[in-house]
Amino acid sequence: MIEKLIFDLSREGRKGYSLSGNDIPELSIETVLPAKFLRTEPADLPEVPESEVVRHFIRLSNMNYHVDKNMYPLGSCTMKYNPKVNDAACDLAGFSELHPLQPEKTVQGALQMMYELSGMLAEIAGMSAVTLQPAAGAHGELTGILLIKKYHEARGSKRSKLLVVDSAHGTNPASAAIAGYEIISVSSNADGRTDLGDLKAKLDGEVAALMLTNPNTIGLFEKDILTIAQMVHENGSLLYMDGANMNALLGITRPGDMGFDVVHYNLHKSFSAPHGGGGPGSGPVGVCEKLIPYLPVPVIERIETPEGSSFRLNTDHPESIGRMMNFYGNFSVLIRAYTYIRMLGATGLRRVSENAIINANYLLSRLDSRYDLPYPKPVLHEFCLSGDRQKKAHGVKTLDIAKRLLDYGYHAPTIYFPLIVSEALMIEPTETETRETLDLFAEALLCIADEAENSPDLLRSAPVNTPVKRLDEAQASRQLNICCQG
């Protein structure tokens, strides 16, 4: 049953509450605001009693899907369960009641937390320094690319090209384009990894950097990464790592040890902050030693004196690329990531990645007999199936499979990405799911594979059990109607 809009529940004269009389004289708004700021007709606001308001939003919340409700298999999104202790740390008055314009001496605890988090992230990825400013992954990409650009400019080199592997997230070429680079695509080989021959052919004196995700979006580790790093560096270029898939690497290996010069982290993914509703995110950037002078300001520094240590925000970095956002990053996500890392420690972080890898390979082993596997096993933290078999044999597309999963009570996985996989189904179970949960999800996909053979029309009309049935997504994206007509 479709829930009505709050405006449709409105009835004239109904009120949620009313205020008792008081002895404060009533003031006419016309005497306070100029006429140009006043409405010419009453606002079209809903008139609904409190009980109906509460029930309306409770009903909507029950229809919502979130990681606290069930497994959230979005590939390349790392929708892990977020420990509630992280939220408790955020709610501490010493954090929640701060204002970013307070004097430094009154926010020493917050500065210490950010300073220590930067150090921990640098150690985890094997980088020399980290900035916490970027607001999310794509913002981190842009920050990293601007650092690369500044590095080349400081050396008198006006390089104009940036290489991006064809399996990359779409934000990679977008971020590079915003920074002013020409995007050159590097092909993947038959194994789903970077084609070294194509990379060699495209490396020239105009290439500023190669952007690479490791493991890549198919869930495969770039086993030739040391060779790739050598090729890039011998060309005078830098190597950038999209850290979207770092949940596979924690405590096992480090991007800095692979030869990456820049890496961004997605704290909301690998380091556990809620992001299913679209944010907030956090995309810190780690750099090698030679890029430190260009980091965004202000830089958090620790000062040692005979009286003890303190922390400050230093803007005196003349080679810096400047600020990447107001203030110091998405602070609440930084607190959650700090708490998560402190709770787990080095051993716990390694177990996170080990269990993520185990879960992905177990789930793949349950599914690869009924869905096509475009590239060979094993994978790391996620995998990519193809619905080509169902499409060719029964006319059932990956979109139909994803829609049918909604009827089984699951959020759909990422579909039609990466672009190098036809009819792609991209699944990332994360480390926080039990074997029983994985089995239930696998059974749903196996049942859907049976339905594709025996009841293809059911899949083509799915979902059939959800409050809202299949939408015309093309029309919805082209003819927006987001206003309520009173």
Swiss-Prot record:
Pfam families: Aminotran_5 (PF00266), GcvP2_C (PF21478)
UniProt cross-references to SUPFAM superfamilies, sorted A to Z: PLP-dependent transferases
One cellular component (GO) term of this entry: cytosol
Record's catalysed reaction(s): N(6)-[(R)-lipoyl]-L-lysyl-[glycine-cleavage complex H protein] + glycine + H(+) = N(6)-[(R)-S(8)-aminomethyldihydrolipoyl]-L-lysyl-[glycine-cleavage complex H protein] + CO2
Record has Oxidoreductase as a keyword: yes
A GO MF label: pyridoxal phosphate binding
EC number: 1.4.4.2
PTM sites of type N6-(pyridoxal phosphate)lysine: K269
Residue spans crossing the bilayer: none
Top EC group: oxidoreductase
Named cofactor requirement(s): pyridoxal 5'-phosphate
Domain of life: Bacteria
Subunit record text: The glycine cleavage system is composed of four proteins: P, T, L and H. In this organism, the P 'protein' is a heterodimer of two subunits.
PANTHER family the UniProt entry points to: GLYCINE DEHYDROGENASE (DECARBOXYLATING), MITOCHONDRIAL (PTHR11773:SF1), GLYCINE DEHYDROGENASE, DECARBOXYLATING (PTHR11773)
HAMAP family hit by this protein: GcvPB
NCBIfam families according to UniProt: PRK04366.1
Family note: Belongs to the GcvP family. C-terminal subunit subfamily.
Protein name: Probable glycine dehydrogenase (decarboxylating) subunit 2
Organism: Chlorobium limicola (strain DSM 245 / NBRC 103803 / 6330)
